[in-house]
């Protein structure tokens, strides 16, 4: 029951009406029987600068940050933890002793989701589609034990991210790795895992997909899309058409959310409860 002592958590982004985050976080809250509530806030770009001070004023404990503000939010924070600073993007903010502190849990969320599907992995050749905040966090996490190639419509952004990965995290000297879209017709067959980190195909633009020649992908490639609404984006439908194994963004959402939840509350949520809340919603 919400009362004057209820602690407020939330999600900021634009849009947010598609998000399952409130569903799964409130399910975890109810399961733990703690007096919290998690709400979604659709924030326009011009109002982003007011979010942090508003959270402090309203005694909001913390919030997730989603597309398109994971990078821009950083300039309004008081502190940023080393991992998020290294990545250059924030998806979790906690108000600690009057200061807004930024974290990033996306990378570990994506890794845990992949591990749930295929087990522990390393030395994989991975193609990352996109170079935004989500791509940065996932790339830096996976580059610790794998080889990452970036593809993006803006080749300059792809090159910059690839350079940062090569300079800071590569476990072996393989140099910068990035591609133009035109290169994929021949190069795509070398990738073990292909991950779409862009919002292309996300609700409400559900009929769009990245222009990637999946018909040329290797037979045992894993095709992941971090989108979870729709549950099966067009990109994954196409992958299935070619007999490829697919993974949507639900697992990543749950695992990154569980880490965020623990940062805010100190409680470890039951990820099965979080997952079932979304699965039951989709079934209904």
Curated annotation (Swiss-Prot):
InterPro entries: Aminoacid_DH-like_N_sf (IPR046346), NAD(P)-bd_dom_sf (IPR036291), SDH_C (IPR041121), Shikimate_DH (IPR011342), Shikimate_DH-bd_N (IPR013708), Shikimate_DH_fam (IPR022893), Shikm_DH/Glu-tRNA_Rdtase (IPR006151). It comes from the Archaea. Shikimate binds at residues 19-21, 66, 91, 106, 228. GO terms for molecular function: NADP binding; shikimate 3-dehydrogenase (NADP+) activity. It catalyses: shikimate + NADP(+) = 3-dehydroshikimate + NADPH + H(+). Its EC number is 1.1.1.25. Pathway: Metabolic intermediate biosynthesis; chorismate biosynthesis; chorismate from D-erythrose 4-phosphate and phosphoenolpyruvate: step 4/7. The active site is at 70 (proton acceptor). Pfam families: SDH_C (PF18317), Shikimate_DH (PF01488), Shikimate_dh_N (PF08501). Keywords: Amino-acid biosynthesis, Aromatic amino acid biosynthesis, NADP, Oxidoreductase. NADP(+) binds at residues 82, 130-134, 226, 249. GO terms for biological process: amino acid biosynthetic process; aromatic amino acid family biosynthetic process; chorismate biosynthetic process; shikimate metabolic process. Involved in the biosynthesis of the chorismate, which leads to the biosynthesis of aromatic amino acids. Catalyzes the reversible NADPH linked reduction of 3-dehydroshikimate (DHSA) to yield shikimate (SA). Homodimer. Belongs to the shikimate dehydrogenase family. This is Shikimate dehydrogenase (NADP(+)). The lineage of its organism: Archaea, Methanobacteriati, Methanobacteriota, Methanomada group, Methanococci.
């Amino acid at each position: 029951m919400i009362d004057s002592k209820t602690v407020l958590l939330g999600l900021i982004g634009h849009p947010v009406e598609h998000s399952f985050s409130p569903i799964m976080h409130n399910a975890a809250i109810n399961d733990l029987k703690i007096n919290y509530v998690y709400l979604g806030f659709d924030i326009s770009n011009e109002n982003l600068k007011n979010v942090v001070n508003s959270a402090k004023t309203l005694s909001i404990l913390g919030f997730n940050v989603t597309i398109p503000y994971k990078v821009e939010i950083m300039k309004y924070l008081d502190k940023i933890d080393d991992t998020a600073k290294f990545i250059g993007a924030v998806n979790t903010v906690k108000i600690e002793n009057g200061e807004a502190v930024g974290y990033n849990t996306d990378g570990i969320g994506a890794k845990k989701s992949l591990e749930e599907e295929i087990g522990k992995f390393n030395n994989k050749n991975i193609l990352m589609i996109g170079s935004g905040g989500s791509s940065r966090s996932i790339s830096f996490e996976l580059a610790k034990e794998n080889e990452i190639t970036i593809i993006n419509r803006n080749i300059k952004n792809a090159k910059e991210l690839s350079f940062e990965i090569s300079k800071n995290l590569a476990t072996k000297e393989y140099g910068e790795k990035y591609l133009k879209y035109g290169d994929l017709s021949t190069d795509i067959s070398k990738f073990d895992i292909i991950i779409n980190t862009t919002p292309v195909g996300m609700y409400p633009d559900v009929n769009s997909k990245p222009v990637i020649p999946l018909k040329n992908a290797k037979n045992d490639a894993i095709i992941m899309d971090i989108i979870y609404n729709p549950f099966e984006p067009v990109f994954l439908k196409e992958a299935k058409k070619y007999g490829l194994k697919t993974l949507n963004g639900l697992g990543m959402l749950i695992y990154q959310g569980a880490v965020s939840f623990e940062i805010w509350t100190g409680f470890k949520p039951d990820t099965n409860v979080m997952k079932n809340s979304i699965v039951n919603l989709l079934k209904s």
